[in-house]
Amino acid sequence: MSDEDDLEDFETDQDDLEREDDEKETEEWEDYRKEGEESEDWISTPLTEDMMKEGLSLLCKTGNGLAHAYVKLEIKDRDLTDIHLLRSYIHLRYVDVSENHLTDLSPLNHLTNLLWLKADGNQLRSARLNELPYLQIASFAYNQITDTEGISHPRLASLDLKGNRIHMVTGLDPQKLISLHTLELRGNQLNSTLGINLPKLKNLFLAQNMLKKVEGLENLSNLTTLHLRDNQIETLSGFSKEMKSLQYLNLRGNMVADLGELAKLRDLPRLRALVLLDNPCTDENDYRQEALVQIAHLERLDKEFYEEEERAEADEIRQRMKEEQEQEAEVEPESELDQSST
């Protein structure tokens, strides 16, 4: 079995990433935070050889094909504070050290064959590691991470940093993160979308932050999914026609009050699904119709697809508006002539 085949078993489920039950994740996040606050002083618990024997599995050939080694390690929820022992297990490809009390992952710098890493629910303040040439999936969810510096793995495809304490995205270099297609940052303390200049990105999750507007995402030409649920967004500026691949946009639970803001989404040529539930604008009687009038190619609003009758009615309204605008344009020159003659 190839490394790629093995990795498929560990990849993040896209359906899970795109589901809309953020409430459950918020509860998990608060549980982790509470646990961390109540247990400031941990008893020192280093990783031991006995623990390694219990956690190792998946026997595979090593790089030269002449020997075998266990390449998967799962040591979850063991109250670990030190994983220094991992330095010598250089053949590991899949490592899960979640739900421990780790503050330092530097021993992983020696695992240059690492493909998959999960370190959720620890006491990490940084996700910084040396460049790992084969690392493809990394999850540091529900820690105490405050920045995004020191992440430069060239084959990294999916990065999960949800439920941390990040205020601003910095240090994510598109010249180094050339494979990153999924970035999970929901449940942080972000007050800006600046710093996410990653043209290869396809899925971006920014729900449950402190965002008031969208900015700096104009060059994400490959982005197909954008989650902005439960922020403080009032205006829909910041979207551009360069975002030509965006198909799904979730703005649920924001502060968009003016239906006219939807006109700013017209330039998104592939936008098919829009979620606006729990925004003030959804209280308007013609909310559903107005959305389709403004965005003609929209197929689904919230959880319901548009019917043919709705689409035909929206077409009629757009045509009527166009004719009225043309008539107004014809009247204006005549008014100017009348004024000049007097």
From Swiss-Prot:
Matching InterPro entries: Leu-rich_rpt, LRR_dom_sf, SDS22/Internalin_LRR
LRR repeat residue intervals: 91-112, 113-133, 134-154, 155-176, 179-199, 200-221, 222-243, 245-266
Matching SUPFAM superfamilies: L domain-like
Transmembrane segments annotated in the record for this chain: none
Family annotation (Gene3D superfamilies): Ribonuclease Inhibitor
Stretch list, region Disordered: 1-42, 307-342
Compositional bias ranges of the Basic and acidic residues kind: 314-324
Keywords: Cell projection, Cilium, Coiled coil, Cytoplasm, Cytoskeleton, Flagellum, Leucine-rich repeat, Repeat
Function: Essential for sperm motility and male fertility. Plays an important role in the proper assembly of the third radial spoke (RS3) head and the bridge structure between RS2 and RS3 in the sperm flagella.
Subunit structure: Component of the axonemal radial spoke complex. Interacts with RSPH3. Interacts with RSPH9.
Protein name: Leucine-rich repeat-containing protein 23
Originating organism: Bos taurus
Gene: LRRC23
